[in-house]
């Protein structure tokens, strides 16, 4: 598909706009891959290669709901990418929200898994009224093409508690940092639509923009992301998977439909964006 080719080329092209500014494209994606549930319509063993292929051409990917053996599979299926992340339980097991990146483009400066809770540095801790631990994987990179620093966060918010999501918004807003020359990118399943108070607060507190709203081009006038495995449910799917950015322009965004044996390869659609970052 043409958008996959575009994603595969992202990061390799410098886009001249004005005589004094050079912009570099960076392909980013977020994908809730669905934890490995043997009762699912399409089992992980039958879809993990397609999951990896759906995002293989992008420079930065935030995954969600990745169990340890699923992380092993993604690393094996994406050998050209580097990765960082661990599970949400105290012992490192459970679902992870790892970050994958193109090491030929991005230098990894450091990363940390933080829990979405007031005691965010206590592994396995619960936040506010959440019934499960939730995490954010926070990574810093140097972009060799633009000379800019990137602050990247992959996260998966609570699906039950407004209070927990609002608390998570406050934490992540701070974790994006306040370096005016750095680019901040939040990738995640926030379990809330863009108009929800918690998402609006995250964008306001951290001066982030929703790529869906600000992209120069969007593949469809409107789309949802939490589709279930069944294509028939897409029309009513809420848009709860988001890419939020600060310090970059957005040329293009789309939620991609990948089908195997008549069903989607996850219960969420992967969302990608082509960002443009000015040269430092």
Q: Model-found features: residue ranges?
A:
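Active-site beta-strand/loop signature of hydrolases that rely on acidic residues for catalysis
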Residues: 26-33, 51-74, 100, 139, ...
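N-terminal, active-site-proximal structural segment of metallo-dependent hydrolase catalytic domains
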Residues: 9-77, 88-95, 277-280
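Metal-dependent phosphoester-hydrolase catalytic domains
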Residues: 163, 176-184, 192-280
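Structured beta-strand-rich core segments of catalytic domains in phosphoester-bond hydrolases
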Residues: 60-149
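Sec-dependent signal peptide recognition
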Residues: 1-8
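Extracellular/periplasmic catalytic domains that process cell-envelope and extracellular macromolecules
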Residues: 20-24, 55, 76, 90-93, ...
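Acidic/histidine-rich helix-loop elements
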Residues: 30-49, 115-131, 158, 232-234
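Solvent-exposed loop/turn segments at secondary-structure junctions
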Residues: 33-36, 67-70, 88-92, 105-106, ...
């Amino acid at each position: 598909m043409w958008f996959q080719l575009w994603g595969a080329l992202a990061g390799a092209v410098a886009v001249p706009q004005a005589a004094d500014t050079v912009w570099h494209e960076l392909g980013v994606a977020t994908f809730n891959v669905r934890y490995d549930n043997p009762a699912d319509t399409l089992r992980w063993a039958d879809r993990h290669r397609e999951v990896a292929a759906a995002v293989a051409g992008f420079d930065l990917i935030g995954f969600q709901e990745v169990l340890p053996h699923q992380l092993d599979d993604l690393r094996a299926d994406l050998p050209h990418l580097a990765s960082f992340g661990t599970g949400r339980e105290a012992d490192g097991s459970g679902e992870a929200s790892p970050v994958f990146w193109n090491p030929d483009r991005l230098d990894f400066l450091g990363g940390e898994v933080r829990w979405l809770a007031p005691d965010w540095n206590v592994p396995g801790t619960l936040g506010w009224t959440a019934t499960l631990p939730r995490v954010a994987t926070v990574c810093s990179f140097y972009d060799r093409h633009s000379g800019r620093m990137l602050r990247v966060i992959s996260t998966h918010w609570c699906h039950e508690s407004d209070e927990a999501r609002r608390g998570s918004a406050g934490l992540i807003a701070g974790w994006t940092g306040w370096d005016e020359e750095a680019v901040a990118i939040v990738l995640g399943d926030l379990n809330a639509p863009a108009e929800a108070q918690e998402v609006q607060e995250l964008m306001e507190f951290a001066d982030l923009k929703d790529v869906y709203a600000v992209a120069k081009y969007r593949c469809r006038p409107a789309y949802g992301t939490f589709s279930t495995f069944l294509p028939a449910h897409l029309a009513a799917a809420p848009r709860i998977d988001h890419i939020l950015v600060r310090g970059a322009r957005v040329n293009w965004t789309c939620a991609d439909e990948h089908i195997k044996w008549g069903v989607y390869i996850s219960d969420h659609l992967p969302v990608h964006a082509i960002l443009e970052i000015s040269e430092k």
